[in-house]
Amino acid sequence: MASKRKSTTPCMIPVKTVVLQDASMEAQPAETLPEGPQQDLPPEASAASSEAAQNPSSTDGSTLANGHRSTLDGYLYSCKYCDFRSHDMTQFVGHMNSEHTDFNKDPTFVCSGCSFLAKTPEGLSLHNATCHSGEASFVWNVAKPDNHVVVEQSIPESTSTPDLAGEPSAEGADGQAEIIITKTPIMKIMKGKAEAKKIHTLKENVPSQPVGEALPKLSTGEMEVREGDHSFINGAVPVSQASASSAKNPHAANGPLIGTVPVLPAGIAQFLSLQQQPPVHAQHHVHQPLPTAKALPKVMIPLSSIPTYNAAMDSNSFLKNSFHKFPYPTKAELCYLTVVTKYPEEQLKIWFTAQRLKQGISWSPEEIEDARKKMFNTVIQSVPQPTITVLNTPLVASAGNVQHLIQAALPGHVVGQPEGTGGGLLVTQPLMANGLQATSSPLPLTVTSVPKQPGVAPINTVCSNTTSAVKVVNAAQSLLTACPSITSQAFLDASIYKNKKSHEQLSALKGSFCRNQFPGQSEVEHLTKVTGLSTREVRKWFSDRRYHCRNLKGSRAMIPGDHSSIIIDSVPEVSFSPSSKVPEVTCIPTTATLATHPSAKRQSWHQTPDFTPTKYKERAPEQLRALESSFAQNPLPLDEELDRLRSETKMTRREIDSWFSERRKKVNAEETKKAEENASQEEEEAAEDEGGEEDLASELRVSGENGSLEMPSSHILAERKVSPIKINLKNLRVTEANGRNEIPGLGACDPEDDESNKLAEQLPGKVSCKKTAQQRHLLRQLFVQTQWPSNQDYDSIMAQTGLPRPEVVRWFGDSRYALKNGQLKWYEDYKRGNFPPGLLVIAPGNRELLQDYYMTHKMLYEEDLQNLCDKTQMSSQQVKQWFAEKMGEETRAVADTGSEDQGPGTGELTAVHKGMGDTYSEVSENSESWEPRVPEASSEPFDTSSPQAGRQLETD
């Protein structure tokens, strides 16, 4: 510790402490908010911050023993009562919200000079940069009227300088006591540690300023936030960059980049001292004095040469983190930042350029690549432009014919034809390092046309899902011409491509996959012996293959000719943006185990020549009319029609092809939906002819019909949500009826075919057992009591219902699944005791009591309810339900005989509903649809015009 303090680099800096108190509340904890990148402080600085926070007066006017004055390069915002310190706004706000529950999350920022109101400190920063660009300091008054934090900003006349635009130092506080902001320099002694890789930029102090004025005292109730020192005559700020001894490996910038340089108004020059540093390798550092601005050369950068700079981007956490990680973003990083920050790419480039100018960072391309390698600890395999000769392919008559073929065989590569070449293709191979695109190395691909030779085995070009190099394997010979700097053995070295599967391995795996998509243990062991892969790798390959077969519908395979075939493994969909020299081509991989007809293949080349599902902006009405009229004539337009549409709609051929493809998909989806509706309607009509719904189909019916009156099946179908199992069942039935062998809508690679066939075989056993309303009632009562019945419960319910044990077990499993997904509508009603009409079990004596009361009064009076409950030992809900059923039966009987005037009047019904709380309506609407109950008085069908009539019970 003593040796550190003897160093010429200061490690103990006086702390500037400002105390702000709220006059109305003095005994509550203090909190502040941060701004700026997160930074770890040395223990000495942290101790100084703590001491200064406890005794602010002790630091005023103090200096170090060595005479070094605080540079005040950064801000440290600390929470007084929990010793939490941070320089990151997001981290400190998270601490406030989680640890201090009385913290107000929505402070208000007011600029009193301009009457400007902002909800966030970023908004106030943007306002200051726009309207107060010449001010160097601001005074903030923080109050908390009506439990709401208000930060008022004023501009003192004595501090106005053209130096720096003030940044708000705190987002807000709870205002109940005092706000302590410690403002300390961030100067950390660089040691040989992995985390101490930072680029320091220090502002030069003006020696003419007295040391005692470095920490002026501020009045209570105000805090003054200052940035920067005195400005020079021309308004420029000198910035010096630390030497290589104070920063270990400037390329590997893991930490924040410290120091800021303001963006001055147009016309004012800005002096920046730039020191271009070569790559620094691991070495021992010797402490030496920090350099001054005079020791480094000055570079004048006119601000007029820099486009408009958006100051609001400085507070964006995504941008700051990306810049701190590496100051030179890649194309992929810029695309990601464009999405998450909503700023255009050009503005992001300007921001990164300005930040590099502020920090004095200027690296050559070689230094950037070297720094990126060291930062990510990744060896980027740069293959020097080998030339691969493809032989024995009938399609290589010209480069134009083979371009699509190469593009399909090389997923993730950009294929183009350079100018001035007769038959060559330029294949740009993007190299990825930890998900970031690195430099691209173009591979010139020589295409030759060789006549067919009898007896030569076909060429199989195999590209696996992780292939980054091209392997062209010929059964007779393998020709590989590489540059002198790399040999063919090194190019195809197994250590480089250890994760790639060979052609023989893929052939064995795909052959087994075509036989069975779910291999057994014996098959997996056989594949491990044949391919040499581990069991885990084999199972993972099968899992990935099944996933792509399910999700990559409509993928195509190509058979170029009789002697050649291309097998392309499925890979994730990746889109690349090539350079301006190469035509923009985006590749989508294909899942190829199915062969298409040659005519279909040719059509696919014309429809989507680059396999890209591209989405375009909305079209004008006249364009849509022209496209719709052409689609009505022919969904697959010819070349002449495409040319006519291009001239008429001013759209590219690619856009027209994409529109037609989407339109065909939409039409196919509508036709499939209609077929499903017709199948469902036929199924329901057949079920009605048989006299009732089958049990399995009834249990799969969704809640669209529940609680509704009987209506035509077409209306019911429009309201239901059909589950996938239901659709499978319907497709199976339609297939059996029409004598077809495959289910419509399912691809040939779908693994659901075998499962669907098994389900069809199990149908007769499941639908043979039908449950009555009483059986379902008993099952539901037990389900409400326990969802996981014991063996005794199963035996009891089997004895009561007469159902076999497998049927009861299956019913409970289906009910638990439906309850988990919120589709068990009757559960809440049974839980409250609201049973369906006709299923209420009442003792004969109690029934006579209720019958006598009903014959006497014709309605249930509220004052007699408790007396009836005591006599019958029934609950009030059950008594009300019995009266509702009784009145419903009488109403239906009156409706059947046509004498509506003999039933209870409207007033009586109103009184009954008032006394009973409209119990029956609640039961009918909130419960699952009930089974139709045969009335005692009549066997005629129910009249659905009655509000209580025609309720259909449905199974769970």
Curated annotation (Swiss-Prot):
Residues 666-677 have a biased composition (Basic and acidic residues). Induction: Up-regulated during osteogenic differentiation of mesenchymal stem cells. The modification Phosphoserine is found at S599, S604, S680, S708, S723, S927, S946. It comes from the Eukaryota. Residues 42-58 have a biased composition (Low complexity). A zinc finger (C2H2-type) spans 77-100, 109-132. PROSITE patterns: HOMEOBOX_2. Residues 1-107, 497-555 are annotated as: Required for nuclear localization. Homodimer (via homeobox domain 1). Heterodimer with ZHX1 (via homeobox domain 1). Heterodimer with ZHX2 (via homeobox domain 1). Heterodimerization with ZHX1 is a prerequisite for repressor activity. Interacts with NFYA. Acts as a transcriptional repressor. Involved in the early stages of mesenchymal stem cell (MSC) osteogenic differentiation. Is a regulator of podocyte gene expression during primary glomerula disease. Binds to promoter DNA. This is Zinc fingers and homeoboxes protein 3. It comes from Homo sapiens (Human).
